[in-house]
Curated annotation (Swiss-Prot):
Belongs to the TRAFAC class myosin-kinesin ATPase superfamily. Myosin family. The keyword DNA-binding does not apply. It comes from Homo sapiens (Human). The modification Phosphoserine is found at S1023. The gene is MYO1F. It comes from the Eukaryota. This is Unconventional myosin-If.
């Protein structure tokens, strides 16, 4: 774009590494796709396109092309101009949001460790760089960027597959103003993996924040929080893994504290957050021993520090960990009894408290970020979905089941929108198309989430949890039996002795049902809630706001039902946006650069459906748009379509495509949409559009400079002031302002222009407040033309195809001559009453002086007499009679108040307006550098002369009496009281908390291999076994019989909207010949009038 020289990390002088867009591959097979990705990966090109879909391969190293130079390179550039990059996709989202006024979202998918979180960071960073804004906007940008290290510290952890694995899902909405400035945001978080707080698998870590705190805390913090080395804590030493390659926990701790500061968390609350994290670590070191079948705390000394950090009594903590209060009902009476727990139950209670504390702390941090970015109303947004990837471990439990279910839903969205919906659209629009087969994973989603006929796995699980009385393995075995009965015959389900198998789109996964029911119940006992509500720290009490006094009614919600609802809500949110896709691929399990595992990549290529995606994109169309939206976006390309096309929408689209010389085989016309085949053709349209805007921007600049130089409204402003002189107080901030006229920008508002006459000039247009019979304020648009006053409102359509949409409605149209007068107060308020024949209008506008002055001028021109103006502090206006309700009058009384803002008080049929004193009634505007002499206003739009007509004819070859001259169209457009223990617990006490022993089988790493593809893989192979013939091109239209035609002898530029423009030698189809000399014809799909003496018949 432009002549500016571009530099890039991929120079055009070096060898081409594979193909940038895999639609161009000569062979479409999984082998060819994987080979192209490998070639580019080995040459350090990690991004590749499939049409508009971006494929990203995790390089496991920092790449050099994410600097400010690349941001400048991709900003505003078309996709084809530069090599594939995540910045190109982000820029496309950002520009489409502003141009099409539509919310956008990007769905980042891939298995764990494929690079999804890093991709989300680059998207946020790019948007922060390219969007403008002042100090407030910069603050929002800082929060958006700093939310990443904070949420990663508390929500990410090292797993076997990924050193920085997201153990929660998030959907980050960046909200924008209409000018494209990020001025707000919102985070939705899903399914934090709470179990990781109390248990980790081998070679994994707990959440990053624990290790950051232990490494980065100051000496004072270590003393106050009783911090030791990680191997001292039971909640950290089970996996015997404390360090991560390439991770500096001490440095990251500083970033986490800085992020909390930016987000607005006060230092005192930051200290309490860290105190809570340390308290959870110390809580985990409380162990239990058996004492006559009951649990007893093994070392009472270990109670002191967690109780101190949590602000609770150590005796109550011991009591709640080893006993539980249970309510029983007998004969209509209820009583509470204390039940002593055994060792297993006590350990479960301790872990439940730790998980509950951490989960509520995480929710607090997310809410703190949302509060810092909150804005009163939503305008535009870009959503970034960064959610846990599909994962398979040696032992897969309830968390993996939920994670893989959400990924299954995301795969379904991709199938619905890129494979299924696209092909169905071609059929509906009448585009010739040969269907392409693919595996639809909806059958797997139904297996998991169906409610009835047959019930899905989640429904069976909820049913077992609602009726279970046994705990532990008893309920889990009941679940397994019921699953076998409900879905045992499903082709994507198998059961085994300790669990079940689901044939996911990404392969077969074996789930161990042990703990499924307990984790699905997700209940925090009321004893523990009561315990935390006794904390001396208000912050901790705030995390437990439950009211436990009332009776509990209804079945409590389960973790499974929550994640199912969240997943479906997420899908609904994504479907309301224009989606973009990033498909992340993990090249190896070693996490090393340039290590390529062919089988692993081919498996991902297959289950991600890349081959089918390429085939649909290759045989299909890169771009499709409804006729009306296409015309709206590209209307500026031709004079005939700007500001709007007045003929048939289909013909308007064809006219635009012909105007840019697009080849007919590059597009097809559907019944309601235009389909453009290649991206290059679309880029052509965008380039021409930008050049047009550039030219018009220069014209606007010239007009603005001329406006500033002339200051033509100085005299008009003084005339308006004379109307109110010695009659009404003036406002200080408005007496010297310039008059603009059109404050609504009617040139760009066809929905408002439709109520005006075809050539009706606009003197004034503004959004005002109208007060009804009950003095209820309603927004209206007030438009003044030389003949009429228009009041336009908005209503929701109740019938028809546009049902539910809000449309503009003409509420009132009053002829200037029908006005009886205008009433105003003597104070500095903005109210006025338009007195009419039927009923009056009580309005409020900050530009009342400008409106009243123009209204007086137009009234005098139409009636040859001045408009009656009334100035009084007691006014009345008549209201329209409705039904049985009386019409009558309403009174408005103005009184002296305080300040410049009016205070309204309604009492029956009277409104009292109080406002402070303004400038004296004798105030006049100050003349600032007005040019001498009255500025001249053009009364007619400029015209372009046509070639000289034949002798005896007037301009444009028409007798002077044949047609009237063009009418003017003139639109003015603007602009603790507990004492701490004497020291940290001794190391000897912690020595009893040794890592748990592991059976030899747990060291098996076969789960890291590429998973068995299962039934989903077999169905994919069956569905794509035969390659269909790609859809044929656009059928050749039948030749149309021609009527009489003529050839242009001279160039003619139309002087009105119903006239044709043409160049020399263009052939026009004659529709009608009129004796007046004006003929009617058709050219480029548009009909209009033209002078007959400018053409010759052929």
């Amino acid at each position: 774009m432009g002549s500016k020289e571009r530099f890039h990390w991929q120079s055009h002088n070096v060898k081409q590494s594979g193909v940038d867009d895999m639609v161009l591959l000569p062979q479409i097979t999984e082998d060819a796709i994987a080979a192209n990705l490998r070639k580019r990966f080995m040459d350090d090109y990690i991004f590749t396109y499939i049409g508009s879909v971006l494929i990203s391969v995790n390089p496991f190293k920092q790449m050099p092309y994410f600097t400010d130079r690349e941001i400048d390179l991709y900003q505003g550039a078309a996709q084809y101009e530069n090599p594939p990059h995540i910045y190109a996709l982000t820029d496309n989202m950002y520009r489409n949001m502003l141009i099409d006024c539509e919310n956008q979202c990007v769905i980042i998918s891939g298995e764990s460790g494929a690079g999804k979180t890093v991709a989300a960071k680059y998207i946020m960073g790019y948007i922060s760089k390219v969007s403008g804004g002042g100090e407030k906007v910069q603050h929002v940008k800082d929060i958006i960027l700093q939310s990443n290290p904070l949420l990663e510290a508390f929500g990410n952890a090292k797993t076997v597959r990924n050193n920085n694995s997201s153990r929660f899902g998030k959907y980050f909405e960046i909200q924008f103003s209409r000018g494209g400035e990020p001025d707000g945001g919102k985070i939705s978080n899903f399914l934090l993996e709470k179990s990781r707080v109390v248990m980790q698998n081998e070679n994994e870590r707990n959440f990053h924040i624990y290790y950051q705190l232990l490494e980065g805390a100051s000496q004072e913090q270590r003393q106050n929080l009783g911090l030791m080395t990680p191997d001292y804590y039971y909640y950290l030493n089970q996996s015997d893994t404390y360090q991560v390659d390439g991770t500096d926990d001490r440095s990251d701790f500083g970033e986490t504290l800085s992020a909390m500061q930016v987000i607005g968390i006060p230092p005192s609350i930051q200290q309490l957050v860290l105190q809570l994290v340390a308290g959870i670590l110390h809580l985990g070191n409380i162990s239990f021993c058996e004492d006559g079948n009951y649990a007893r705390v093994e070392s009472v000394d270990l109670l002191a520090f967690p109780a101190y950090l949590l602000g609770i009594d150590s005796g109550r903590l011991q009591e709640k960990l080893t006993s539980r209060k249970m309510d029983s009902r007998w004969g209509g009476r209820s009583e509470s009894i204390n039940v002593t727990l055994n060792v297993e139950q006590a350990a479960y209670t301790r872990d439940a408290l730790a998980k509950g504390l951490y989960a509520r702390l995480f929710d607090f941090l997310v809410e703190a970020i949302n509060r810092a970015m909150q804005k009163p109303q939503e305008e535009y947004s870009i959503g970034v979905l960064d959610i846990y990837g599909f994962e398979i471990f040696q032992k897969n439990g309830f968390e993996q089941f939920c994670i893989n279910f959400v990924n299954e839903k995301l795969q379904q969205i991709f199938i619905e929108l890129t494979l299924k919906a696209e092909q169905e659209e071609y059929v509906q629009e009448g585009i010739r198309w040969t269907p392409i087969q693919y595996f639809n994973n909806k059958v797997v989603c139904d297996l998991i989430e169906n409610k009835l006929s047959p019930p899905g796995i989640m429904s069976v699980l909820d049913d077992v949890c609602a009726t279970m009385h046994a705990t532990g393995g008893g309920a889990d075995q009941t679940l397994l039996q019921k699953l076998q009965a409900a879905v045992g015959t499903h082709e994507h389900f198998n059961s085994w002795s300790a669990g079940f198998v689901i044939h996911h789109y990404a392969g077969k996964v074996s789930y161990d049902v042990s703990g499924f029911c307990e984790r699905n119940r997700d209940v925090l006992f009321s004893d523990l809630i009561e315990l935390m509500q006794t904390s001396e720290q208000a912050f901790l009490r705030m995390l437990f706001p439950e009211k436990l006094d009332g009776d509990k009614k209804g079945r409590p919600s389960t973790a499974g039902s929550k994640i199912k609802k969240q997943a479906n809500d997420l899908v609904a949110t994504l479907m309301r946006c224009t989606p973009h896709y990033i498909r992340c691929i993990k090249p190896n399990e070693t996490k090393r650069p340039r290590d390529w595992e062919e089988n692993r990549v081919k498996h991902q290529v297959e289950y991600l459906g890349l081959k089918e995606n390429i085939r649909v994109r290759r045989a299909g169309f890169a771009y499709r748009r409804q006729f009306a939206k296409f015309l709206q976006r590209y209307a500026i390309l031709t004079p005939e379509t700007w500001p709007r096309w007045r003929g048939d929408e289909r013909q308007g689209v064809q006219h635009l495509l012909r105007a840019v010389n697009m080849e007919p085989d590059q597009y097809q016309m559907g019944s309601t949409k235009v389909f453009v085949k290649n991206p290059e053709s679309l880029f052509l349209l965008e380039e021409v559009r930008e050049r047009k805007f550039d030219g018009f921007a220069r014209t606007i600049q010239k007009a603005w400079r001329r406006h500033v130089a002339v200051r033509k409204y100085e005299e008009m402003r003084e005339e308006a002031s004379n109307i109110l002189l010695n009659k009404k107080e003036r406002r200080r901030n408005s007496i010297n302002r310039n008059f603009v006229g059109d404050y609504l920008g009617l040139e760009e508002r066809p929905e408002l222009r439709q109520f005006l006459g075809k050539r009706e000039r606009v003197d004034f247009a503004d959004s005002v407040t109208k007060y009804d019979r009950r003095f209820k304020p309603i927004k209206r648009d007030l438009i003044l033309t030389p003949k009429c006053v228009y009041v336009i409102g908005r209503e929701k359509v109740k019938k028809g195809p546009e049902k539910g949409q809000v449309c503009e409605v003409l509420k009132k149209k009053v002829d200037i001559q029908a006005l009886r007068g205008v009433s105003l107060s003597t104070r500095q308020d903005d109210f006025f009453i338009l007195q009419e024949d039927a009923a009056d209008s009580f309005l409020e506008s900050v530009f009342k002086t400008e409106f009243v002055s123009l209204l007086c001028k137009r009234f005098e021109e139409a009636t040859r007499r001045p408009l009656p103006l009334t100035f009084s502090d007691t006014l009345q206006f008549r209201v329209k009679k409705e039904g049985w309700g009386g019409g009558g009058t309403r009174s408005v009384t103005f009184s002296r108040g305080f300040g410049d803002l009016a205070v309204l008080k309604v009492g029956g049929r009277t409104l009292t307006v109080s406002v402070g004193d303004g400038l004296p009634k004798s105030s006049k505007p100050t003349r600032k550098g007005m040019a001498k002499g009255k500025p001249r206003r053009s009364s007619q739009a400029p015209t372009r002369a046509a070639p000289a007509p034949p002798r005896g004819m007037d301009r444009n070859g028409v007798p002077p009496s044949a047609r009237g001259g063009p009418l003017p169209l003139e639109i003015m457009s603007g602009g603790g009281t507990h004492r701490p223990p004497r020291g940290p617990p001794s190391t000897s006490l912690g020595a009893s908390r040794r890592p748990r022993a592991r059976p030899p089988s747990e060291h098996n790493t076969e789960f890291l291999n590429v998973p068995d593809q299962g039934m989903a893989g077999m169905q994919r192979k069956r569905s794509v076994g035969q390659r269909p013939v790609p859809g044929v091109g656009r059928p050749k239209p039948q030749p149309r019989t021609h009527g009489p035609r003529c050839r242009a002898l001279y160039q003619y530029v139309g002087q009105d909207v119903d006239e044709l423009s043409f160049n020399v030698n263009e052939v026009i189809e004659i529709l009608m010949e009129d004796p007046s000399g004006w003929w009617k014809g058709r050219l480029h799909g548009q009909e209009g009038l033209f002078p007959g003496n400018y053409v010759e018949k052929i």
